[in-house]
Design a protein with these regions (language model features):
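A membrane-interface helix-boundary motif in multi-pass transporters
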Residues: 43-69, 261-279
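Helix-to-loop junctions at the C-terminal end of transmembrane segments
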Residues: 165-179, 263
């Protein structure tokens, strides 16, 4: 949420979606490099080199976990030393003191037209999408006997599509087509993607479904973030985008739980088919969004 708030601070409304795309591209490269690093480093079994540490929790996946920890520490040090406040003092809003750890309060209406529908639509979309993400490796192993390296290739493919679509299409066309229309197109692409994955019995069908999903999410995420930012006054960007991202994080908690229970209780296809139907709700909600005013 901090990264997107910074983009909102330093871009004009008419260029907001282009700025958000760069955040999306960064995440896409994370999708490409992260699984590649994880898949390759998983082949290094630290238990063979440090057997005395097994009693302290060392396991076959400790190497990728250790690399992730080191990268997180580097990121923390870099941000501590280099990150500066991006919003000028005269544009900053007053501090909000009525913060709460109650997730229900995230759904409390905000007084900015369009923000509430966007927030709820984003929450519902991410519930379905994160459920797919979480159960995807289960399905790939159950139906096609995918190994950890096969899973890495799968997520590299997703990241490549996201980077290609956001860098080559969304960045150029979002300002012309409009963030609302592009978000609706993205949601519409997710539906056949989920259905194809639910039907997949071969890698070819699986990858076709993943291409739909990656393309759809590439359109939705930067455009919805941009819409929330455009609908919100500049001095409240951090608050509004923070709530938007918090609802996304909550969806990423609920979605995998529901999808996993559905997967193991009712079968591997059910969470994907039900997710496709469920996406009709945010598709309808987002179609009711007001056209953003860029002036």
């Amino acid at each position: 949420s901090t990264a997107t708030a910074v983009v909102a601070d330093v871009t004009q409304k008419e260029n907001r979606s282009k700025g958000m795309v760069f955040v999306g591209i960064a995440f896409a490269f994370g999708f490409i490099l992260g699984p590649a690093i994880g898949g390759l480093s998983a082949k290094i079994n630290l238990m063979e080199y440090f057997p005395s540490l097994i009693k302290y929790g060392l396991n076959p996946f400790s190497t990728p976990a250790l690399i992730a920890c080191v990268l997180s520490c580097i990121n923390l040090v870099f941000l501590t030393l280099k990150f500066k406040e991006s919003l000028p003092p005269e544009k900053r809003g007053e501090s909000i003191n009525d913060r709460s750890f109650n997730p229900i309060k995230l759904f409390r209406p905000l007084p900015y037209p369009g923000v509430n529908l966007t927030n709820i639509g984003h929450f519902l979309f991410l519930m379905a999408f994160s459920g797919m993400e979480f159960t995807l490796t289960f399905l790939a192993f159950e139906r096609m006997a995918y190994t950890p390296m096969d899973n890495a290739y799968m997520f590299i493919f997703i990241g490549f599509i996201i980077a290609l679509v956001q860098g080559g299409y969304v960045r150029r066309k979002a300002g012309i087509i409009g963030e609302k229309s592009m978000s609706l197109r993205g949601l519409a692409l997710l539906i056949p993607g989920l259905i194809l994955i639910g039907l997949a019995e071969s890698s070819f069908i699986l990858y076709v479904g993943l291409a739909f999903l990656a393309t759809g999410s590439s359109l939705i995420i930067p455009c919805l973030t941009s819409l929330v930012s455009i609908y919100t006054p500049s001095q409240y960007q951090g608050q509004s985008i923070g709530i938007f991202r918090s609802l996304g994080a909550l969806a990423r908690v609920i979605g995998p739980i529901v999808a996993s229970i559905t997967y193991w209780r009712y079968g591997s296809a059910v969470p994907y088919f039900s997710g496709a139907i469920f996406l009709l709700i945010p598709l309808y909600m987002l179609s009711k969004l007001p056209q953003p005013k860029l002036a």
